[in-house]
Amino acid sequence: MNLTKKIFKFLAENIKLNNLQNVKIFNVALGEKNDSVFFSSKRSDDLNSVSITEQGEEISLCKLDDLPINESKINLMKIDVLGYEKFVFEGAKKILKITECIHLPIIPSDCERYGYDFNDIFEMLRNLGFQLFTFSEKNISAIKSNFNSNTQDILAVKDLEGFLARTKYTLVK
């Protein structure tokens, strides 16, 4: 999902240029409901996000569960939505049931901008059967319930043994 028309066009051209066949792209924002939202239009595209002030480009908002994704299993989901993770996950209950691993950056101040604490995401993922880890290089460490960080990349994993065997990561205790 890439929202601004400019970035979506770049993505579509990149897919065509690289002759990728098994890729579907959707020019929508993901969230907890089907509606519309405003998306910021900052010069630096990597800083754009759902606007809380109703300024920017108006775009369609839909639940991930409502996209035409016909997979029986998702090995890895990458989510990077600058604090909107909680709402994406709320609209992805079915998809998360078939997802084995999620990679997401957590920036507490981004979560706070949308009125929730990053631990809300952790609780939601744990309730869906995920174990949470920080990682560095080829090492992962379990996240304790009192986790506190300014910025951290997180792995949410359902089958730890399978993940370790597949990736050759090491669990650091």
Ranges and model annotations:
Residues M1-K173:
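Phosphate/nucleotide-binding beta-alpha loop and adjacent structural elements of enzyme active sites
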